[in-house]
Design a protein with these regions (language model features):
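Charge-dense, helix-prone N-terminal extensions
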Residues: 1-108
């Protein structure tokens, strides 16, 4: 899977606006991952993102438009990971909200 370099830049800009320091980038699942310590919390993947969510938010977030479970093998979803389609993060505030959800997912 490739990733959208413009989306990577948008994620990096959002993290600057959130004053999140120490976040690094790494290739993950064929996309470009953003890491808090050793944990990926959001991955630019295709034209959308993959997000690590807090366990208690997973079921409700899965009901949002443009969101589906992440199943890297095509069969079994990884618990607490969601795919968010490009349309669901078209605006910067929406993208920022998903980034914050990802950060909560790895910091709990």
């Amino acid at each position: 899977m490739t990733f959208d370099k413009g989306l990577v830049a948008r994620i990096a800009d959002a993290l600057l606006q959130l004053r999140e320091n120490g976040i690094r980038q790494k290739n993950v699942f064929g996309g470009r991952g953003f890491m808090d310590g050793k944990s990926a919390f959001v991955i630019a993947w295709g034209s959308g993102i993959i997000v690590k969510t807090a366990r208690e938010e997973y079921e409700s977030l899965m009901k949002e438009p443009g969101v589906s479970p992440f199943a890297p093998d095509g069969e079994r979803p990884m618990s607490t990971w969601l795919v968010v389609e490009a349309d669901a993060i078209a605006d910067d505030p929406e993208l920022t909200e998903w980034i914050q959800r990802g950060l909560r997912g790895v910091r709990r």
